[in-house]
Design a protein with these regions (language model features):
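GIY-YIG nuclease catalytic motif and its immediate N-terminal context
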Residues: 1-58, 62-82, 86-90, 94-97
């Protein structure tokens, strides 16, 4: 994975079965590594391997949890649109929210 990205992020993982998992963390690199090692959320443990497909940096924990909840409410198509836009922007987490 890329160099450690510290600060609060909301992220999406694509699981082996094609499903998407949304989460929030204050250490993106470490959290994705834990998911990949089977030490993340119960949901991802049974769906390895996982791939980071979206991440956005947010201001603080409160913003991260709000954004995570909003992402989890999106339809699959809306989540995939986030992934496409993120890749088009060069996969850089940007401060927001």
């Amino acid at each position: 994975m890329a160099p450690a990205r510290r600060g609060w992020h909301v992220y999406l993982l694509r699981c082996q079965d094609g499903t998407l998992y949304a989460g929030a963390t204050n250490d993106l690199t470490a959290r994705v590594d834990r998911h990949a090692a089977g030490q993340g959320a119960r949901y991802t443990r049974s769906r390895l391997p996982v791939e980071l497909v979206f991440a956005v940096r947010v201001r603080n924990r409160s913003a991260a949890l709000r954004r995570e909840a909003a992402v989890k409410k999106l339809t699959r198509a809306e989540k995939l649109a986030l992934v496409v836009r993120w890749r088009e922007k060069g996969a850089a987490g940007t401060p927001s929210g």
